[in-house]
Amino acid sequence: MKQELIERFTRYVKIDTQSNEESHTVPTTPGQIEFGKLLVEELKEIGLTEVTMDDNGYVMATLPANTDKDVPVIGFLAHLDTATDFTGKNVKPQIHENFDGNAITLNEELNVVLTPEQFPELPSYKGHTIITTDGTTLLGADDKAGLTEIMVAMNHLIHNPQIKHGKIRVAFTPDEEIGRGPAHFDVEAFGASFAYTMDGGPLGGLEYESFNAAGAKLTFNGTNTHPGTAKNKMRNATKLAMEFNGYLPVEEAPEYTEGYEGFYHLLSLNGDVEQSKAYYIIRDFDRENFEARKNNVKNIVKTMQEKYGEDAVVLEMNDQYYNMLEKIEPVREIVDIAYEAMKSLDIEPNIHPIRGGTDGSQLSYMGLPTPNIFTGGENYHGKFEYVSVDTMEKAVQVIVEIARRFEEQA
């Protein structure tokens, strides 16, 4: 199983599937279509049935039941795309067997070093096989680790028919990283009563609370003139963007928050004197606080418009997803089964809120309650990203055990 995980994962991460916030196509990048087509063929090779990829790039497949019991149909999901925060092109995964727990030089030329000082969890992976980047790209364990685990788990169930299970549905979705994963997901066609996203982090992660999330695009319009004669004429769009950011509470940013604390996060800022564009994400677990944060952004924009003119700042803000807890609580047994599955495998469940989002956040509101399970990755979305193959193996075992327990309890 370990070699299959390594082989699949290292092959999958080499395919550039970064999504693109600016694109209006579905999916937003051709790499996701390419990857989806590959997975369709591999799902068929494994032996799954009803394997499809629709025009929007959503891949679905079925592992038929091997029991006569009336078992609820369950699903397992992962996403095709990788994050836009750092380059995902030309990923060169590096395999470190029997990791010694010490610093790893990812790229000697660029002096990129993965250190325990910066990442204190690193020594806990001593003895594991871990896969890192070469220091020039992200790895893409989010979510190709989860995707790999689902593929390997389905293969394992097919080759071990003594493990009884009900009908299992599998889905791989595009554009999760930009909040559009479930936008065209056909819940009815998927046909599951419940599902699990394999999109978590370290060993034991079990999550069924997520942020309420919104995205805000701000366009700042300036007036450019020669700087030598600019007095009372020039309006610097980049300075307007800086002024806007200055209104936000400094301590309410990702680098200063944890647990149930929300934040404003400036994802990118590009521009010049004439025009600048800033992209923010807004996050909070509490719905009232979430609405208050959005109103704060609107009020800052209004203040600046009154100061500089209506055209100086243009705001586009959209909700992306909501806290899934409200939809999971009525079917709490799906969390309990995952919890019991982990305990039976000597994995200590680590239940905590997702400081991020998964497709499950939106799917839960679309009628498909979907908690999230660990995949084994650390430091997502950057050059220090890595994954433990040993933990990936545990994730596969959890998928298999969840399927077995649903059948057993039917």
UniProtKB/Swiss-Prot annotation:
Keyword Cytoplasm listed: yes
GO molecular function: metallopeptidase activity; tripeptide aminopeptidase activity; zinc ion binding
GO biological process: peptide catabolic process; proteolysis
Compartment(s) of residence: Cytoplasm
Cofactor(s) in the UniProt record: Zn(2+)
GO terms under cellular component: cytosol
Residues reported to bind Zn(2+) 1: H79, D142, D199
Manner of cofactor binding, per the entry note: Binds 2 Zn(2+) ions per subunit.
Pfam families: M20_dimer, Peptidase_M20
Keyword set, alphabetical order: Aminopeptidase, Cytoplasm, Hydrolase, Metal-binding, Metalloprotease, Protease, Zinc
Enzyme Commission code(s) on record: 3.4.11.4
Keyword Cytoplasm part of the UniProt annotation: yes
Chain ranges passing through the membrane: none
Binding site for Zn(2+) 2: D142, E177, H381
Active site, renumbered: D81, E176
CDD domains in the cross-refs: M20_peptT
EC primary class: hydrolase
Catalytic reaction(s) noted: Release of the N-terminal residue from a tripeptide
Function (record text): Cleaves the N-terminal amino acid of tripeptides.
Similarity comment: family membership: Belongs to the peptidase M20B family.
Name this protein carries in UniProt: Peptidase T
Biological source species: Bacillus cereus (strain B4264)
Native organism taxonomy: Bacteria, Bacillati, Bacillota, Bacilli, Bacillales
